[in-house]
Amino acid sequence: MLSLKYRIVLGLAAVVMLIDQGTKWLVEATIPFHGTVPVIHGVFDLVNIRNRGAAFGFLNRSDIEWQFWLFLVATVLAVWAILSLTRASKNEPVLYTAFGLIMGGALGNLVDRIRYRAVVDFLDFYWGEWHWPAFNVADIAICIGAFLAFVAMYRQPSPERGNKE
């Protein structure tokens, strides 16, 4: 049987991946490709777009074919690193939560990359002419996970700070 730390990481990753894929399925079933559904006029729309790049549109260019392989390898390495760090860590529930969120988000976006060679993005925030790049549930999970990992590592005692919290 898997230890509690692996159950936390893998269980949360599975939940994130299912929510991510479920929301993307709902968007694809209800919003035409490149369609827009206004939610809060002038602030927030639901959209159905594809992003071939990384988070927030980085490397989102159709003329770059190698980015699929880059993101595939990066996801495999991230999952391997998360499992290795989980094995090496001792009783760190915040860190396990962070790892589960990051892994679930990475795997959710990987499913899209395998299906479409792009990621389905649907949350679009803007103000006037300013637009934040569209994103999805997987991106949210990765960002929250990265923040929690930072918090967990910052809380670790260091030789310079001693064991004070």
From Swiss-Prot:
The keyword Repressor does not apply. GO terms for molecular function: aspartic-type endopeptidase activity. Belongs to the peptidase A8 family. This is Lipoprotein signal peptidase. Its EC number is 3.4.23.36. This protein specifically catalyzes the removal of signal peptides from prolipoproteins. It comes from the Bacteria. The keyword Cell division does not apply. It is a multi-pass membrane protein. It comes from Nitratidesulfovibrio vulgaris (strain ATCC 29579 / DSM 644 / CCUG 34227 / NCIMB 8303 / VKM B-1760 / Hildenborough). Pathway: Protein modification; lipoprotein biosynthesis (signal peptide cleavage).
